[in-house]
Amino acid sequence: MKKEKILKQIDKLKSIAIAEGIDLSSEINRLRGLLELESDDYKKEKEIEEVFSIVQNSRKVERPKPQDFIKALIKDFIELKGDRRFANDEAVIGGIGYFDKYPVTAVGIQKGHTLNENITFNFGSPHPEGYRKALRLAFQAEKFSRPILFFVDTPGAYPGIDSEERGMAQAIAENLYYLSDLKTPIISIITGEGGSGGALALGVSDILIMMQNAILSVISPEGCASILFKDSSKAAQAAVSLKLTSFDLLSLGIVDKVIDEGPGLDIDPQIGYKNLADQISTSLAYFSSLNQKELVEHRYQKLRKIGFYKDTTGFVKKGLNKSKNFIYELFKF
């Protein structure tokens, strides 16, 4: 029942109650309850619409991709290829250059703006050699004390048989393991999609930054809807449940900073570039001032806090002591 129709019925019942002197309060209250439900449904529909529009925005081909961010922010960039074990993965671009006065290593999971580019970049889904390339460059950055900038835009790691045969799970796990203890500043930026372990492999950092209209999730809304609702067409509802927007993740303490895009990266990327550059400058100045021990400890504490809810150790010990005392009193002779 529509909101306007319910309001008209309430007004009509009020008029009848006054004119006839009849108590219609129970029926009026019932309609008011329906009105509240209608308002809640409207709010839910609005939220679903807004969240899914962010998901669609994050996937737009017009949005700058990681290679565009590198081109805009990194001077004198020199690309370095290959993982030195199997092959060069075109889905991952990496190399060295300058951000302002800082020599940096920049690595990005890149997507294309055209069909041919997306075929070359495997639609932004890296193979194991892509993650091993990123880790090789990270070790090199540590050796030469260069900060690392990770730019992430991926629906997830490539799930094909060839990826499994070459050790995808191990490649991602090794990134998580070694990056958590790397003794050089790491800044990760989610520029578009941040899909599952494929994004997490470049997300271990001293500060995790998201562009305003980017998303980060353990699974795509379509995949989640297929599993939970058995219907991929309910992706919009799943997107709300996943809490995948930058502001959701900021409130949960998973993301550290959200970058204002202005009118949108697909409309005018320069505003987003400038705001991101300002944040990177601030972060590099701070993390470069820490010694290696302080840097790794900061990263450790940051990662440990994610998902932390409440320490119940004290309550458990107190409860155990009470139980022991009760049993002692019960059975003493």
Predicted regions and their residues:
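Cleft-lining beta-strand/loop regions that shape enzyme active-site pockets
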Residues: 98-180, 185-191, 196
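Intrinsically disordered, low-complexity segments enriched in small/flexible residues
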Residues: 1-103, 111, 123, 274-333
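Terminal peptide-recognition signature
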Residues: 6, 50, 106, 153, ...
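Short, motif-level signal for alpha-helix interfacial/capping segments enriched in acidic residues
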Residues: 27, 31, 130-131, 224
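Conserved catalytic cores of soluble enzyme domains
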Residues: 2, 152-281, 285, 289
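Hydrophobic alpha-helical segments
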Residues: 92, 131, 135-138, 236, ...
